[in-house]
């Protein structure tokens, strides 16, 4: 039975819980203190990617990925409440699909809203099934917080764009078959107006992906060099020179996704406190409650934003609030894990200490990736509170005339 054959919530919930119990491992029983995101070896990262891809396909085949996507685009044509029920029943199960979930959350709404019929029918089925891996190609060495200053150029040659430039901090790019790529197509326009959004083939000549190995050994970030690679005009998402709108939508979805992917850290922190015999200490209990409650609030906010995006409506909560909230949560979680373990928390001796070490590593990158805290505070001040904008010396100037470092 598939999701589109069920109209009763109780029946759907029963089918979902039964399928999960028969097909997916419980995190608590099979993978306590699981380390999914910050693995210190390429071998583990590669295996994690393969496992996530298989899990994405398994969820898709069972009707639990692409639940609300129309059937003509490879989805299951279900209702939004079905996604909610699945999330509720899947709590505690190992259904995380790593960066597949992340890139789908960012890319799918943009394709559904801005894509042509051909683009949607071509790309959405393989995106939501995990058959094709995607990555985001936005940030550049000289355009991170000021993304609209990007310099990767695309020049039209007949019906193809010829592209030259560099992207950086591209998660999972080493595995990607396709990418969502921002390029400069009109240097004579103001910097926000000459950008085009492309659906880009990563497996072609002229594309070089280099892993960025971090201090603790992980290499899931990459830098991408593009030297003469091509992209057909049929792969423009939206309009030429009008890519900033779809790009902003992707970034809003990214903020909501980061909040929705908050995981089960509070539950694991509680388990760790119990195992260490510290769960009854007043200060520890106070910190556990704070982390647990903030995590619940974060998921509620993220779901409200995601529900609005799925309906094509403006988000009721500014996505920057969610991004700042999750960054603060990560710091609280990392501090609490180290508080529980003490000096043992900086030496990996077992699964619990390895997990705590990863929380420690994750405390500050989340304040940078997906837009720095400072950028998101500016967004809130200007867009939500109506405060005066920062002084910009490049306002009203063509991109080509803006001084560059």
Q: Which residues does each PLM region occupy?
A:
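Amphipathic, small/basic residue-rich leader segments at the start of a protein or domain
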Residues: 1-101, 122-126, 284-285, 289, ...
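A short core secondary-structure module
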Residues: 159-160, 164-210
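Glycine-rich beta->alpha junctions and the first turn(s) of the following alpha-helix
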Residues: 3-5, 11, 207-301, 308, ...
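Internal helix-loop-helix
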Residues: 53-130, 172-178, 258, 295, ...
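A structural signal for short hydrophobic beta-strand segments in well-ordered beta-sheet cores
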Residues: 152-155
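Short, charged, amphipathic alpha-helical segments
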Residues: 285-289, 317-324
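Alpha-helix capping/hinge segments and adjacent helical runs
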Residues: 22, 26, 60, 64, ...
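A short, Trp-centered hydrophobic/proline-enriched beta-strand micro-motif
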Residues: 130-138, 182
């Amino acid at each position: 039975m598939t999701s589109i054959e069920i109209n009763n919530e109780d029946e759907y919930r029963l089918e979902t819980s039964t399928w999960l119990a028969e097909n997916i491992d419980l995190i608590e029983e099979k993978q306590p203190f699981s380390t999914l995101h910050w693995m210190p070896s390429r071998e583990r990262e590669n295996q994690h990617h393969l496992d996530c891809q298989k899990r994405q396909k398994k969820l898709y085949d069972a009707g639990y990925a692409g639940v609300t996507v129309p059937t003509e685009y490879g989805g299951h044509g279900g209702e939004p409440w079905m996604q909610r029920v699945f999330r509720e029943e899947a709590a505690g199960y190992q259904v995380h699909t790593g960066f597949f979930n992340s890139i789908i959350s960012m890319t799918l709404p943009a394709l559904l809203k801005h894509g042509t019929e051909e683009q949607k029918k071509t790309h959405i089925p393989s995106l939501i099934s995990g058959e094709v891996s995607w990555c985001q190609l936005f940030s550049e060495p000289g355009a991170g917080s000021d993304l609209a200053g990007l310099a990767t150029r695309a020049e039209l040659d007949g019906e193809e764009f010829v592209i030259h430039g560099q992207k950086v901090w591209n998660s999972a790019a080493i595995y990607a078959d396709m990418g969502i790529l921002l390029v400069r197509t009109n240097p004579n326009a103001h910097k926000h107006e000459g950008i085009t959004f492309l659906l880009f083939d990563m497996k072609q000549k002229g594309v070089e992906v280099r892993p960025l190995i971090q201090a603790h050994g992980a290499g899931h970030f990459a830098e991408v060099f593009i030297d003469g690679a091509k992209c057909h005009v049929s792969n423009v998402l939206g309009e030429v020179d009008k890519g900033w709108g779809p790009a902003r939508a992707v970034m809003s979805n990214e903020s909501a996704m980061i909040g929705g992917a908050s995981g089960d850290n509070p539950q694991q922190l509680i388990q760790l406190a119990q195992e260490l015999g510290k769960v009854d200490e007043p200060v520890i209990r106070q910190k556990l409650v704070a982390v647990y409650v903030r995590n619940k609030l974060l998921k509620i906010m993220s779901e409200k934003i995601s529900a609005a995006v799925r309906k094509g409506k403006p988000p009721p909560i500014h996505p920057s609030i969610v991004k700042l909230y999750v960054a603060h949560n990560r710091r609280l979680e990392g501090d609490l894990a180290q508080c529980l373990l003490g000096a043992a928390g900086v030496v990996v001796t077992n699964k619990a200490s390895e997990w705590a070490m990863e929380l420690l590593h994750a405390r500050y990158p989340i304040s940078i990736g997906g837009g720095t805290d400072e950028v998101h505070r500016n967004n809130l001040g200007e867009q939500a509170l109506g405060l005066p904008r920062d002084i910009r010396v490049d306002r009203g100037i063509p991109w080509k005339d803006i001084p560059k470092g």
